[in-house]
């Protein structure tokens, strides 16, 4: 049971870290297709989506 709590605490601490590589660029958008060419210019890959009116790119 102690091992379970130890693993649980470690999981909670690791989940609080921001391990994602996502990049918010300062480009307004209405839909994800608008972000693809802007992400290609910004980070070199056309992988992204529109979230809350801003483009979010994934390297």
Swiss-Prot record:
Residues 1-22 form the signal peptide. The record marks 49 as: Basic residue of the functional dyad. GO terms for cellular component: extracellular region. Keywords: Disulfide bond, Ion channel impairing toxin, Neurotoxin, Potassium channel impairing toxin, Secreted, Signal, Toxin, Voltage-gated potassium channel impairing toxin. Belongs to the short scorpion toxin superfamily. Potassium channel inhibitor family. Alpha-KTx 04 subfamily. Inhibits with low potency Kv1.1/KCNA1, Kv1.2/KCNA2, Kv1.3/KCNA3 and Kv11.1/KCNH2/ERG1 voltage-gated potassium channels. This is Potassium channel toxin alpha-KTx 4.5. The lineage of its organism: Eukaryota, Metazoa, Ecdysozoa, Arthropoda, Chelicerata.
